């Protein structure tokens, strides 16, 4: 039997890789580059359209624990991320082009994988296994078909990305290298005095935004709030948010600046840097004016402007079973952000989970849920079963995990124990139920 996968994002790539390497015949449909979305720039698989950061690798951080579990199950995304990483302190960040190019090469070289560069606008859910991993920018043609298949409309939220500037245009005479609390030198820090900060804040709140159809501030995703929306919530909101100076000492003064704009490397050569926390929907001309209010970026060359886009997803608790199959059509699976998980790693992890159970089904075995003590198990359980009302996108966090049997007051120690329990549960699960 051929397994059909629609969409070669992070989730789709994990599905294809994990099935293909186990001898399963896979037909992968990807419409890019023949038909592009409003946010993609290339035809590569696993293209990163927002940040180039996969966040923390420490297991006492929810994102780090999620990665540890993914590695235990097997993840092509993390394998390639290790090979294409760029310096980013305690976070795992990648050269976005090298990363996507390598994932594409690996999948293209797989003998069991047939790649079809065409848009899918419909399919027969009763013929074979179908895995929909088309992400938040699913094409209108397929959306129409899926609405009919699901019998209900999609949910959506708004997301935004940050601008990227060239390194050679940054004024390094004022900027300084460093991570918070002296834990590395991977970020470029652009310090602001109180006067400079207030000038930047004023420019942000007065800047014109690009109007969007159906735009609603309540539908902005909390971890990707546009910088201008944060600014409008109060004069000091940015200074206690993405521009907080905590743990960053300017070597010129020996003190923490009033505020700091951080820049994160985008590529291995260090030619391009993104503005951390500067997701925006400002008009492009306004973005340039605002960025030039930052002294270190007065002459900045903007190589990619920030944009906002609408992300769609299904109401998973209503339409999916615990294995991410359609309740109406058990041979149709969903994976990735279209299910309501939020984040790069969360999307990739859902692809691994779907691939695991599809492989079991193909071998005549029953699908299995992951232990709820694991971050993956708890996240997927939440998405499917633990939501009241309409689903809101959810990312990995320790609040999803069942509490420890004993109360631990110290936050770090509590997270450490939760992580140890999660990894033990995943290890035992995979020993008992290997791929």
Swiss-Prot record:
Pfam family, one: GIDA
Chain positions recorded as FAD binding sites: 7-12
EC number(s) reported in the record: 2.1.1.74
Catalytic activities: uridine(54) in tRNA + (6R)-5,10-methylene-5,6,7,8-tetrahydrofolate + NADH + H(+) = 5-methyluridine(54) in tRNA + (6S)-5,6,7,8-tetrahydrofolate + NAD(+); uridine(54) in tRNA + (6R)-5,10-methylene-5,6,7,8-tetrahydrofolate + NADPH + H(+) = 5-methyluridine(54) in tRNA + (6S)-5,6,7,8-tetrahydrofolate + NADP(+)
UniProt keyword annotation of Transmembrane present: no
A Gene Ontology molecular function term of the record: tRNA (uracil(54)-C5)-methyltransferase activity, 5,10-methylenetetrahydrofolate-dependent
This protein's GO CC annotations: cytosol
Record function comment: Catalyzes the folate-dependent formation of 5-methyl-uridine at position 54 (M-5-U54) in all tRNAs.
Official protein name in the record: Methylenetetrahydrofolate--tRNA-(uracil-5-)-methyltransferase TrmFO
């Amino acid at each position: 039997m051929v397994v059909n996968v629609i969409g070669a994002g992070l989730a789709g790539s994990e599905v294809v890789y994990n099935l293909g390497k186990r001898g399963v015949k896979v037909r992968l449909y990807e419409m890019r580059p023949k038909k592009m979305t409003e946010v993609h720039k290339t035809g590569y698989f696993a293209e990163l359209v927002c940040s180039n950061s996969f966040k923390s690798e420490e297991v006492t951080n929810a994102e780090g624990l999620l990665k540890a579990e993914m590695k235990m199950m097997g993840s092509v995304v993390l394998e390639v991320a290790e090979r294409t990483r760029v310096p980013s302190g305690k976070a795992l960040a990648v050269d976005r082009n090298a990363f996507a190019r390598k994932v594409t090469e690996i999948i293209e070289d797989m003998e069991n994988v047939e790649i079809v560069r065409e848009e899918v606008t419909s399919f027969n859910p009763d013929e074979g296994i179908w895995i929909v991993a088309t992400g938040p920018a699913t094409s209108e043609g397929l959306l129409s078909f899926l609405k009919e298949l699901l019998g209900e409309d999609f949910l959506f939220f708004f997301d935004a990305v940050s601008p990227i500037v060239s390194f050679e245009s940054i004024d390094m005479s004022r900027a300084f290298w460093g991570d918070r609390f002296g834990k590395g030198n991977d970020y470029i820090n652009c310090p602001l005095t109180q006067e400079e900060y207030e000038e930047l804040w004023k420019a942000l709140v007065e800047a014109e935004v690009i109007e969007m159809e159906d735009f609603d501030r309540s539908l902005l995703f909390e971890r990707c709030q546009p910088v201008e929306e944060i600014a409008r919530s109060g004069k000091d909101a940015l200074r206690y948010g993405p521009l907080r100076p905590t743990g960053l000492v300017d070597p010129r003064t020996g003190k923490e600046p009033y505020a700091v704009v951080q820049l994160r490397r985008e590529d291995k050569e260090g030619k391009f840097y993104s503005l951390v926390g500067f997701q925006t929907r400002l008009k492009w001309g306004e973005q340039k004016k605002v960025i030039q209010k930052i002294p270190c970026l007065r002459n900045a060359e903007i190589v990619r402007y920030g944009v906002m886009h609408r992300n769609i997803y299904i109401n998973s608790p209503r339409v999916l079973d615990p294995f991410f199959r359609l309740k109406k059509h058990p041979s149709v699976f969903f994976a990735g952000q279209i299910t309501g998980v939020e984040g790069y790693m969360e999307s990739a992890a859902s692809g691994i989970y779907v691939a695991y159970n599809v492989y079991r089904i193909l071998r005549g075995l029953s699908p299995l849920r992951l232990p709820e003590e694991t971050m993956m198990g708890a996240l997927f359980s939440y998405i499917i079963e633990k939501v009241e009302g309409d689903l809101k996108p959810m990312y990995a966090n320790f609040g999803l995990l069942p509490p420890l049997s004993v109360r631990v007051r110290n936050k770090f120690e509590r997270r450490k124990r939760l992580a140890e329990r999660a990894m033990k549960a995943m290890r035992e699960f995979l020993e008992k139920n290997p791929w």
